[in-house]
Amino acid sequence: MAVPQSIPPPTAAPIESKDQVFARSKAFWDNYLRGRPQVPPSFFQRIYRYHREHGGRFGTVHDVGAGIGPYAGELRSQFPHVIVSDIVPKNVQLAEAHLGRDGFRYRAAPVEVADDLPPGSVDLAFATNVMHFADQHAAMQAIATQLRPGGTFACAGFGPARFDDPDIQDVWERISQQGGRILLGMAEHPPDTINVMSRSSKEYNVAPLEPQWFRPGALRIRLNMAQGGITGLLPPERQQEVTDPDFAGPRDVVVYETNEEWRFETDWEGFLQHFRSFPHAGADPAAFTGLLQELKDLLDEGRCLRGCWPATLILATRR
């Protein structure tokens, strides 16, 4: 594989506070869409099948914490009404600019706030790559309140690659942990950020499903976890500061699967796109120079950037 002779710096603008983590430019989001997993059709088919088999209606879906709405168009193919929400108003504006108004409604709000949505008005709440940021119990209460009885909560977490080559994966983990150190140094409330980082790693520990709100037998489907799961940001020296419990309940059904549709092979440019899809990449570019060079040296030896996208999908039915 040919690689450039120099390592170009990340193009994302520096982050000044945690509130800006995903308040990013259109250029950042364009790279995000290229650098993150291309979700296979089977992911959505599984959600729709579960929803149908559990008596769900196909009326209104709420894309919670949607960012710029990369999955809202797919949801619109099955639901005539799609609510697109994000905590960052600019993201909602970008979503509206490319999705339009036909069947879409937009709102700027965090996951935990749903006072403007009539109780029981949503058939499916879709929360992908957002639940780790939220106050878990407040978010689940808001989701449960908006869902109609028999409605579906579909929650997923994926994003960071896991590489087959152990040496490449080792460098990638150290790059990710360096990013975690940078974000923790900028955090207004480091204990909260530590829990966010912990939730989003390994098996994606989110979404307590209280029995008064959800039927027993919710599925926690863990894809491609055999080699360690989702590559996390939390530095090893901060692991002991995690205070979250395990949010999987005793009535939940945990399923482990390997899915070849979530595999990838990329090149150096593809890796840089992936790296730049994380907000910390632009915060302190010099902090990553040596690590990126270490990875480039491995590629110069003929190593390959193959791997998988570990992913978790949670499916639960509202009582």
UniProtKB/Swiss-Prot annotation:
Matching Pfam families: Methyltransf_11 (PF08241)
Positions of the UniProt region annotated as Methyltransferase domain: 63-155
Enzyme Commission no: 2.1.1.-
Single GO BP term: secondary metabolite biosynthetic process
Family: Belongs to the methyltransferase superfamily.
Functional description taken from the UniProt entry: Methyltransferase; part of the gene cluster that mediates the biosynthesis of trypacidin, a mycotoxin with antiprotozoal activity and that plays a role in the infection process. The pathway begins with the synthesis of atrochrysone thioester by the polyketide synthase (PKS) tpcC. The atrochrysone carboxyl ACP thioesterase tpcB then breaks the thioester bond and releases the atrochrysone carboxylic acid from tpcC. The decarboxylase tpcK converts atrochrysone carboxylic acid to atrochrysone which is further reduced into emodin anthrone.
UniProt-recorded name of the protein: Methyltransferase tpcM
Organism: Aspergillus fumigatus (strain ATCC MYA-4609 / CBS 101355 / FGSC A1100 / Af293)
Lineage: Eukaryota, Fungi, Dikarya, Ascomycota, Pezizomycotina
